[in-house]
Structure formats: C-alpha cells, structure tokens
Amino acid sequence: MRKEEFCKLLDEMTSPDRVIDLLHAPNWRFWQKPQKIDEGQLFYILREYIETRTKKEDTHIRENTYLVLGKLLLRAMEPEHCQFFIDRLAEENDKYVLHSMLGCISRLRIPPEVNISELAACSRSDQWLVRHSAIQTLGASDSEASREAVRYWVRHTDEKKFKFELIYANAVLGYIGVAEDIMLLENHIHSRIRDVRDTAAYAVENIRKRVPALSEEQTPAGGL
C-alpha cells in the first residue's frame, strides 16, 4: 500500500459519516491492508497526518488518528513516537479528545526514557474528566516522575473534596509505588471514606508483595 492509499484510508476511517458495517468499515480495512508498509513509516505518516490537521473542525479526525497511533504503539512500542503522543496532550484542549488520548496511553507500557511531564500536567487539570483519567494513566509509567505526580494527590488530606483523586492515586501507587510510599499511603488507611480506606490498604499490601525484603522496614510502630 502506498502512502497516498494509506492516507485515503485514514480519511475514510476518520470521517464522521464513516461506514459502520464491520466487514467493510475503513477501521477494519485499515488493520488488514497496511501490512506491507513498514511500521516505522506508519508512525511518521500518522504524525504528519495529525500535525497537518489543525483546524477546529479537524478535532474528530485527530481524535480517531490518535486511536490508530495508540493501537500501533501497543503493537510496536517506539519511545520516540510514544513521546510524540504524550507531548500532543499539550496541543489539545477538548476534554473528550484528551480523555480518549489518555485512555489509549493508559494501555501502553511507557518506556523509562519518555518524558511524562505533559501527562503529569494533565493529572492536575481543572477539568475533572481529564484529571481523573490522567491520574489513572500515570500507572502506565514506572518512573519516579510518575510516582511523584501520583504522590501529589496521595498527600492531600481533604478526603471529602478529593475523594476520587485519592481513590485513583492510591490504586495507581499500589502498582508503581516503592517501599517508601507505604507510610504515605497509611495516612488514609483509617479514612472514614470506605473506598479511600480500601484502596490505600490494598496499595500497601500490593507494594509489600512486590518488595518483601523492605516490608518490615515499613511496618508502622503501632503494628509492632
């Protein structure tokens, strides 16, 4: 398949009036036909496609193209293109597009060399839909930067105001946190809000399972 054919197929797939029938839908044909195109070339075609569609009316097109980019990264992770995807979070302002992008990123395993600053910024967004999605997506990166972005929310003490942020942050820290995070999480183990309490307790348990050699060092004095 030539680049021109590929872009035409993208045009069909991202069109608002695209065909829905599974066997004939552009989305289905997209994943069947491009096998003859090198994956490295696919990435650059997608990036160019996104960067050249900057108008407001192109929002839907970019959103669908991000879905394709996310699927391709899931199939063949390339740090350079993963970085491009994350950096694009700063270029979009539609909360539904950002939510969709974050959903794609959350399914990836972000390489350690990728800068997640734009993802961290989204985790403090004024838009709750974006903020909540971003906090959960931080779990895709096992980096200190990601952990610190999650700790920002776990350190909050107003559990009523930041209930959902704490629930999501506790859960994520359970998967990417280190032994030193146990004491931070234990601040919420006796929360009056059940979901905050349960996610904190589960996170502590999960970290201890992953770092058993350090678990005793993190045992609170009251537990001795």
Spans of features found by a protein language model:
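Structural detector for internal amphipathic alpha-helices that build alpha-solenoid repeat scaffolds
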Residues: 19-40, 60-76, 95-111, 129-143, ...
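Short inter-helical turns and helix N-cap capping residues of alpha-solenoid HEAT/ARM repeat scaffolds
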Residues: 15-17, 57-58, 93-94, 126-127, ...
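N-terminal "cap/leader" segments of large eukaryotic alpha-helical scaffolds
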Residues: 1-29
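Residue-identity detector for threonine
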Residues: 14, 52-54, 59, 65, ...
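Amphipathic alpha-helical scaffolding segments comprising HEAT/armadillo-like alpha-solenoid repeats
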Residues: 1-11, 36-53, 75-90, 110-124, ...
